[in-house]
Amino acid sequence: MQRRKFLSTAALSLPVLAFANQQASSSENKRNRTGKGFVVKSGQSRFGEQTKLGGKSPNDIKVSTKDTNGDLTIFEYTGNEKGGPPLHIHPNQDEIFFIMSGSFLFKVGEEQFTLTTGDTIFLPRNVPHTWAQLSEQGKMYFQFQPSGKMEDFFRVLGALKAAPSPEQGAKIFADHDMQVVGPPLSF
């Protein structure tokens, strides 16, 4: 009888322990978050870090994973050439893009959308997607939720002296928890 009582008591205490662990984790997240608001000026990056994709197009961190304890990262991309990434999947992240200027073609699953100034698009996790800048100049905000390894991904791309081969690109994507599943958009 003692064993049965012990097992019943232990089983009943599991939800309480899980709740306490969740509360402790939540408190830790709050401690690690930025405690103050902040401003990042136009043309600047959160910690003064400059990343240029292809050596030409600034991709500035506006809200860092450090600010949100990994919950969210926001970038401002200023595209100075046409083109975009290969078709890929983020298994763990949703993305949102807001077009500030220019024209962009997005592919999400089997659908394609042309976005211009003021448009927003949501890209759910686990859905193949890509985009291409159609205009000579373009600017957009985009965010990842949760952050994942995206800040490091763009640092690696920004440090490249030349465009990676498709194989090198696929490895860079894989190293940052993404999967390349097709080529960039043709336009």
Kindly give the residue locations of the regions a language model identified.
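Histidine-centered catalytic micro-motifs
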Residues: 86-92, 130
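N-terminal export signals
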Residues: 2-26
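Short, conserved beta-strand element in jelly-roll/cupin
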Residues: 78, 91-106
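C-terminal segment of N-terminal export signals and the immediately downstream linker at the start
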Residues: 20-55, 159
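Ligand-binding loop in jelly-roll beta-barrel domains
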Residues: 125-151
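Short acidic-glycine-tyrosine-enriched beta hairpin
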Residues: 111-125
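Acidic/histidine-enriched, glycine/proline-rich intrinsically disordered or flexible terminal extensions
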Residues: 156, 160-187
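A short glycine-rich, His/Asp/Glu-containing loop-to-beta-strand
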Residues: 50-87
